[in-house]
């Protein structure tokens, strides 16, 4: 079926972007997973989504951070087109059982207001982020108009502020809801280094504080 073919392609593309995203956040992802071609995805997961081959739940990802293997994160692909509070509770139950506090939820069409509220209520014990499938069809950081973003460590931020004798409040800002900030999972108070090509200087670097 043409619908199955299109849906399989979408699921492969979305999962690929998610793997790139968690890899760019410093989580461990095997290179063959990052490079997985569509045909290999079909062999591994199936090519008939209409028959639950794959079911979205088959695509669940669990990754550990490069710097701290205890820092693990789930990526869930719920079956429900619109996510309600029941799904959020089931996700938190699974996180609790495995002692994992971070997760990304990939939603098909959206979330109910009560589900969104419950995500806010569960922070900071459970840090849940959500992305629409449509947002993950392309990797925003690969767009030619998006400059390179490098997330600074707390030490690098302190060094930057000391070097230029600045306070946080004096840095230019980037909103936490900015698409690139969301891609990197940035939190308020973090600083990102933005590197743009420059005809005169080779490259032009700016710093932004997440607010």
Curated annotation (Swiss-Prot):
This protein's UniProt keywords: DNA-directed RNA polymerase, Nucleus, Transcription
Keyword Phosphoprotein: no
One GO term describing the cellular component: RNA polymerase I complex
Pfam family, one: RNA_pol_Rpb5_C
PROSITE patterns reported in the protein's UniProt record: RNA_POL_H_23KD
Family: Belongs to the archaeal Rpo5/eukaryotic RPB5 RNA polymerase subunit family.
PANTHER family: DNA-DIRECTED RNA POLYMERASES I, II, AND III SUBUNIT RPABC1
Protein name as it appears in the record: DNA-directed RNA polymerases I, II, and III subunit RPABC1
Organism, scientific name: Caenorhabditis elegans
Gene field: rpb-5
